[in-house]
Structure formats: C-alpha cells, structure tokens
Amino acid sequence: MRGIIKNIREQLFIHPVESFCDTFFVFHALWTLIWILAYSTNLSLSAISPIFFLLIPLAVLTLAFKGQATGQPTPSATRRARRDTLSVLMLVAGAILLTLFLHRPDADDEQYLGMAFSLLANADQPIQQLPGYDGTLYANAFSVISAYEPLKAMVSYVTGLPLLASYYVLLPALMSAVTVVVTYRLLRELVPEGWLVGMLFFFVVMIAWGDVHRTLANFGFVRMFQGKSVLVSAVVPAIFLYWYLARDKGQAGYHSFLVSAALVTGVGVSRGGLIIGPLVLAFLGLASINFRSLGKGATAILVVTVIIASTLLVFAYRSGWSLMNPSQLVYTPRGDVSSTTNLEMLEFTMGSGARAIFLLMCVAASFLFVEDKRLRYSYQNFLAIFFLLLLIPWTSNFFAKTFQQYLSWRWMWVAPIPVLASVTVGGAVASIRQVSNSALALGVFLVIAVAFAAASPRRVLSQENYTSVRWPDAKLDGDSVYFRPHNKAAAIKNGKLHLEGYEKGF
C-alpha cells in the first residue's frame, strides 16, 4: 500500500499535467459506464450519487500502475519541465477564459439542457420515467450513451450549484483545460522542439477559423458546453496521444488502458463517439502495421482480410444496407438528399477559402516534421489513409448511407485538423530557429498567424459567426429557454431555471 501511495504522489507532483489528463479520462470512462448501468436498471440520479464520490479516487488510483521513468532527471531537464508546466498552465487559463467569455448560443441546447434539467429536477425519480429519457431502450439510445448532460446534472446535485453554472461554466472550463493538455502532450510527442509554437498556432486556429458553422474551431472553446465538441477537441486527439504513447513497451499496458478509457469517454460525451472513436482507432491500427516485420504468411493473411473486408463493405454500400440510416438520405447543406460529394462536405466543414486550403496543406506536410522515425511511419500512414479517403469520390456517401446520416461530414472528425496543422507550423518554425535565429522564426510565425487570422472577416470571434464577448454566464439569449423534452419554456430568474410544474428553480 505504501508503494502505491508513493507512486501516486510522485506522479501527481512530478508530472501534474499528465496525471490530470490521465485521471480525467479514467474518471469520465467510469462515469459513462455507471451512467449506462443506471439508465439500463432504471435507477435515479440520487441513487448513484454515492458512487459518484468514489470515481475520482478510483481514477487517481490508476496512476499507481504507471511505470517509473528510468534514471534521474538532470537539473536542466527539471527546470525545463517546470517551465513547460508553467507554459501549459498559462495556456489552460487562456482557454478557460475563451470558453467562459465567448458567447455563441446553439439551438441543440433546447434538447440537451432540457434533459439535464429533467434529471436534476427529478433526482429521486427513476431515470426512464423522466422527460427526454422515457420510452424504449432502442428509441432512446442517445439517452443511454450520452453521459455529459447527466454529469452536469450530477455536479449540480452534489454541489448545490444552479444547473446553468455547471452546464455553461464549470464543466466547459474543465473540458477546455483537458483539450489544452491533450493538445500539448500530442504536439510534444510529434514535434518536441516546436510544441509551444504549435500550441500558439492551435489557439490562432481555434479563434480565427470560423469560415463556416461546422469548422472544428466552432466545435472548440466556443462550444465546450456540448459533448460533440469535447469529442472532436479532446477525445479524438487523446486517442492519438495514448496510441502513440503505447508504443513504449515499458508503458504499453498503462497507455493501452488509457486508449480504452478515451474510447469509452468518447461514447459518453457524444453518441458520435460510438463510430468516430473506433474508426480513429482502426485507422491508427492499420497505419501502424509494419509489413517488414511480418512474415510472408501473416502478410498474405492480412492482404486477403483487407480484400474481403473491402469487398463486403462495397457490397453493403451497393446493396443499400445501413446500420442506422434506413432512409438512405445524406445530410448536406442542401438538406437531406440522396447523395453528396467529398468536395461538398469539405466546403461544409472547412469552408472554401484560403484557410481551408492552408490547413489541409499543413496537415499533408506535417509528417515531415515528426522527429521520431517509428512514430513518423505510423503517422504518415494515417495521413495517407485520410487523404486517400478524401480522394475517393463516394467516401462521404458511403459513411452516411451505410452507417449514419450525419457521418456524411462527421467522418472527417477522425483527423483533428487544428492539431495536425499545428505540427507543421510548430515544426517549421523550430527548424528555422535552428538554422537561423529566434527573431526570424518569430517573424515567420507572426506572418503566418496574422495572415491566417486576416484571411476572412468571418472568424470564430466575430459577428458574422454569431459570436460575442460577454461576462461568463449561460450561453442563451433572452430570459427563457425552450425545453424540447418538456414541450414548454423555462424562465431564467436569478441564475436558475424555473419550469411550470416545479416549485423551485434549479
């Protein structure tokens, strides 16, 4: 027991940023599993509250199973680690401020906020009897797997905070911190000498890239109150991170466990995580296969398996087979139509201007700046898979018709574009600094950042993007909000939600 406590203490004090990140994904994975169990057995929110208090200690306990680094760090390495930690904390503070002060309401909260209200206002009632959660298991699959709104309700239940505070302030701030830490760790693995510049460019992208409604930046700091934003901004990069960290055989078991935790977390924050998470993992797995280390027999089996799988997928697509889209309609900017193209979906999610072109070029070139050769092999293969799918004209149609309607564009979430593009900028600036001087490197970065921000008047923070700066509060307009699950509007009074039929506000 003393050894376990000692190991946990060392991880928390020597690697606080990494420990926070790892603990979060284990915590949220455990919470997701508890929520699914609670819904399936028709428990109440209050019934699972005692278990909720155990989740953080259990998550912290997993740090004890992380192996110790070999050797003692040098004084210079220790100073650098402290400097890096301080830099990350400053970036975290900046991200939290952006999340809290940027105001961009979204109509989907009529559903999500209404479901969270149902849980908090009826904490002692069985979950499946509540508005938004009643009905059959199949009809409410979204309710089963989405644990983000229940987490907000639980936080308000155990702390006494108004629901609007946990929904729009506390939890989004936490998710912004996780996003920054995950991005920092992934960039540090890919471009250890250029991670700081990469992080700065990441922030530029997340503030400026508002060309269209569905850019990944519009699913970033400005929208952390919704689970789909957590999925694309934090969970997908985390799957990359832990997959690459698992290549270290000494830590393979620990980081493989964290890959699983990230996958479960993805399912918990958004139902899209059911497909996006495994899809990312499948692409990373394929990209990591080293054919040189395989024998002829294993290579032949693998090739045959890929051919059979590809044939079956094509057959399923051509035959009209669908997992969750029996209508065979595809979601596009033109509405629900019979077909689309990858180009239309790229414009739908990235825009058609200079920013989109620059980001795609940066992503395509990013493997050139990955220093670790083993990591570069897997990384460049992933990029090859992603761009190959972009070049196949019917990829968006295939994902939408065969799996789910909204995958016509959401399948592109497998590539965290802002992070991967930052690899190129960070790596390029670091290379310039090495062959020239810091002043020139800084000048190049400033030119890139200013040009990117000025490429279009529609930025994340702009009136054209329907974003304003306000004091941290609910991301709602007006003094009421309509709840779809209840088919009525709730009034907002003194920071609390008041709904007809309930004696008090929540």
Identify the role of each PLM range:
Residues 263, 302-310, 428-462:
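Signature aromatic-anchored transmembrane alpha helix within multi-pass, membrane-resident enzymes
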Residues 106-111, 137, 270-384, 391:
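Transmembrane catalytic cores of multi-pass membrane glycosyltransferases
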Residues 173-176, 222, 228-235, 401-431:
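Hydrophobic/aromatic-rich transmembrane helices and adjacent perimembrane loops
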Residues 4-5, 11, 78, 189, ...:
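Membrane-interface helix-loop-helix junctions at transmembrane boundaries of multi-pass membrane enzymes
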Residues 447-506:
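Extracytoplasmic
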Residues 91-226, 230-234, 463-477, 484:
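Active-site lumenal/periplasmic loops and adjacent helix-entry segments of GT-C-fold
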Residues 254-272, 282-283:
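Membrane-interface alpha helices of multi-pass inner-membrane proteins
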Residues 1-78, 312-339, 383, 389-390, ...:
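Membrane-embedded, hydrophobic transmembrane alpha-helices
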